[in-house]
C-alpha cells in the first residue's frame, strides 16, 4: 500500500509541476514597526485575501523573480489547474514573508484561518521512496505535507543516487505547490462567493442569455445559487457545467426544496463530472457497496431520525469505517480509486459521517452512476 501510494503521490507531484506566468505577490512585512512603533494601523489587523501563503525568511528567495525564484510560477500553474477542475476562477494567492515563522516554515491560510503549514528546504530535494526503494538515503526524515508519506530531504548532489535507488525526487517548490493544490480543492466551497457566481452567470449569458435571465434571479436568487454551488463543491462536485445546473434548477425550483436537497437532486445530472474524477472512460469504476441487510437498516434509521440525520451506534460506526477504509486501501494499493455506492435515501447522511474519518472517499448514489460505464464491485460491507 505504501509503495503504491508513493507512486500516486509522485504522479500528483509531477502533475502539479506546472509553469505559469504570474501570481499575486504582495509586499513584505519585514519593515513593519520600524517607524511609529506604538501605532497600530487597520491593515495590521485586517487582511481580506481569500488565499494567502506566509513564508519564513529562508524561503523568500523562492518568490524573488530577480533571483529566478520558481514558486510564483508554480502557484499560478496550480491556480489555473484547480480553477479548470472546479469550474470557477480560484482567487489570487497573496504571498508574504512572516518573521514570526521559522526560517524554512510556510503557512497557508484560507481567509484568516490557518489550513496548512509545514517546512521545506530551498537548497534540498524531497525524496519519496517508490515501489523498489530498498536502500535508505541519508537526510532529514519527514512526512510529506500532502500525502503524509515517509520522505527524506536530501542534498542536491544525492538526487542521482536517490533516483537510482527507486526514490521519486521532488523540488521544494513543487512540494509546497502540491500541498496548496490539495488545500484549494479541499476548501473550494469557501473560495466561491456571489461575485464569483455572477461572473460565471455573465459568461454563460453570452451563449445562453434566455436561460440565465429566466432562472436567476426570477426562480433562484443569486445567494441561493451560490449556496447550492458551495454545497456541490463541498462534496467534490465540479460546477463547471453551469448550463446543466441552471436547466435543472428551472425544473426543481417549483418543488420548494432546501439548498441541501436541491444540491442532492442536481447530483445525478452531473454524474459524468463525478465519475470522471475516479476512472477514465476506458476503465471500470471500482465500487464498494453495502449489503442489502445493512443498507435497509440504515435507510430505516434515517427515516426514524428525520431532520437529525443518521445517528449510528459507536461500535457499528467504527466497524463500518474500518471495513470501508480497508476496502478502499486495497484498491488504492493497485493504483486505482474506489467509490462507495449506496442508496439515494442515505447517501448524503452516510457521506457526512464518513467524511469525518475517510476524507478522500467519494460516496455516490446508485442513481449517479452513468448507464454506459462498466462497474467492478471490489467489496461488499456488512454489519456482521
Please give the residue ranges for each predicted region:
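Small-residue-enriched core segments of transmembrane alpha-helices in multipass membrane transport
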Residues: 1-9
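Membrane-embedded alpha-helical signal segments
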Residues: 11-384
Amino acid at each position: 500500500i505504501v509503495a503504491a501510494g508513493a507512486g500516486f503521490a509522485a504522479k500528483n507531484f509531477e502533475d502539479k509541476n506546472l509553469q505559469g506566468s504570474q501570481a499575486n505577490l504582495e509586499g513584505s512585512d519585514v519593515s513593519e514597526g520600524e517607524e511609529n512603533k506604538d501605532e497600530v494601523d487597520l491593515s495590521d489587523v485586517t487582511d481580506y485575501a481569500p488565499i494567502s501563503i506566509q513564508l519564513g525568511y529562508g524561503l523568500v528567495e523562492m518568490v524573488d523573480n530577480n533571483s529566478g525564484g520558481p514558486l510564483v510560477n508554480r502557484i499560478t500553474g496550480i491556480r489555473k489547474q484547480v480553477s479548470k477542475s472546479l469550474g470557477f476562477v480560484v482567487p489570487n494567492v497573496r504571498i508574504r514573508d512572516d518573521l514570526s515563522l521559522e526560517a524554512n516554515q510556510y503557512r497557508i491560510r484560507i481567509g484568516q484561518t490557518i489550513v496548512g503549514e509545514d517546512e521545506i528546504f530551498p537548497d534540498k530535494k524531497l525524496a519519496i521512496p517508490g515501489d523498489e526503494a530498498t536502500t535508505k538515503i541519508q537526510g532529514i526524515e519527514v512526512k510529506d505535507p500532502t500525502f503524509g508519506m515517509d520522505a527524506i530531504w536530501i542534498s542536491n548532489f544525492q538526487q542521482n543516487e536517490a533516483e537510482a535507488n527507486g526514490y521519486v525526487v521532488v523540488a521544494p517548490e513543487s512540494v509546497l505547490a502540491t500541498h496548496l493544490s490539495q488545500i484549494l480543492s479541499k476548501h473550494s466551497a469557501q473560495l466561491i462567493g456571489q461575485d464569483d457566481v455572477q461572473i460565471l452567470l455573465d459568461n454563460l449569458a453570452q451563449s445562453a442569455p434566455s436561460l440565465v435571465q429566466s432562472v436567476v434571479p426570477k426562480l433562484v436568487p443569486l445567494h441561493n445559487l451560490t449556496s447550492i454551488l458551495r454545497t456541490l463543491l463541498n462534496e467534490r462536485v465540479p460546477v463547471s457545467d453551469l448550463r446543466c445546473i441552471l436547466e435543472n434548477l428551472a425544473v426543481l425550483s417549483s418543488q420548494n426544496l432546501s439548498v441541501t436537497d436541491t444540491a442532492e437532486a442536481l447530483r445525478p445530472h452531473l454524474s459524468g463530472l463525478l465519475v470522471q474524477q475516479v476512472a477514465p472512460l476506458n476503465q471500470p469504476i471500482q465500487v464498494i457497496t453495502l449489503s442489502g441487510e445493512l443498507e435497509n437498516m440504515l435507510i430505516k434509521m434515517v427515516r426514524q431520525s428525520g431532520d437529525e440525520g443518521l445517528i449510528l451506534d459507536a461500535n457499528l460506526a467504527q466497524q463500518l469505517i474500518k471495513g470501508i477504509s480497508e476496502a478502499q486501501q486495497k484498491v488504492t494499493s493497485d493504483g486505482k480509486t474506489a467509490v462507495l455506492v449506496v442508496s439515494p435515501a442515505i447517501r448524503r447522511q452516510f457521506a457526512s459521517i464518513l467524511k469525518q474519518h475517510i476524507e478522500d472517499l467519494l460516496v455516490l448514489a446508485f442513481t449517479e452512476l452513468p448507464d454506459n460505464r462498466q462497474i467492478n464491485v471490489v467489496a461488499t460491507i456488512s454489519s456482521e
